[in-house]
């Protein structure tokens, strides 16, 4: 099957994402294009094999992973102040520590987080303008 250049680039980028990042991407695509969540619209007895596998893989990944790391990928120059404030609000770092944490990216900012804590911290940092991944 041949794809155009843009599609090949997208597939290459997608292959580097972890399961949580893919899940976030799917949710954003659903919201952007107003696509209903197929998992919630499928009745348990009516699952097709591929749909059942996707659901089982998602549940399995959620069960296996209980501790997460928050990795700060990028901080746009114009968003530095907002990101520094968000870092100080999500960590115990002082201003110097927060500045040091954005000096050499990517950098692990937090570790041993529950999924809920990790998602909350990720949301705060992304709202401030940072690019963050959970691992």
From Swiss-Prot:
One term of GO molecular function: structural constituent of ribosome
GO terms classed as biological process: translation
PANTHER family: 39S RIBOSOMAL PROTEIN L12, LARGE RIBOSOMAL SUBUNIT PROTEIN BL12M
Annotated family: Belongs to the bacterial ribosomal protein bL12 family.
Subcellular location: Plastid
Keywords assigned: Plastid, Ribonucleoprotein, Ribosomal protein
Gene3D superfamilies the UniProt entry points to: 3.30.1390.10
GO CC terms of this entry: plastid; ribonucleoprotein complex; ribosome
InterPro entries in the cross-refs: Ribosomal_bL12, Ribosomal_bL12_C, Ribosomal_bL12_C/ClpS-like, Ribosomal_bL12_oligo_N_sf
Primary role: Forms part of the ribosomal stalk which helps the ribosome interact with GTP-bound translation factors. Is thus essential for accurate translation.
Predominant location category: plastid
Subunit structure: Homodimer. Part of the ribosomal stalk of the 50S ribosomal subunit. Forms a multimeric L10(L12)X complex, where L10 forms an elongated spine to which 2 to 4 L12 dimers bind in a sequential fashion. Binds GTP-bound translation factors.
Protein name, per record: Large ribosomal subunit protein bL12c
């Amino acid at each position: 099957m041949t794809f155009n250049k843009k599609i090949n680039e997208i597939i290459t980028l997608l292959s580097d994402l972890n399961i949580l990042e893919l899940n976030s991407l799917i949710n954003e695509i659903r919201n952007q294009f107003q696509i209903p969540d197929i998992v919630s619209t499928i009745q348990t007895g009516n699952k097709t094999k591929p749909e059942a596998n996707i659901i089982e893989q998602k549940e399995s990944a959620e069960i296996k992973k209980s501790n997460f790391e928050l990795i700060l990928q990028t901080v746009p120059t114009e968003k530095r102040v907002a990101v520094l404030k968000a870092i100080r609000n999500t960590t115990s770092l002082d201003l110097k520590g927060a500045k040091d944490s954005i000096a050499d990216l990517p950098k692990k900012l937090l570790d041993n987080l529950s999924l809920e804590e990790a998602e909350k911290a990720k949301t705060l940092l992304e709202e401030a303008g940072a690019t963050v991944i959970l691992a």
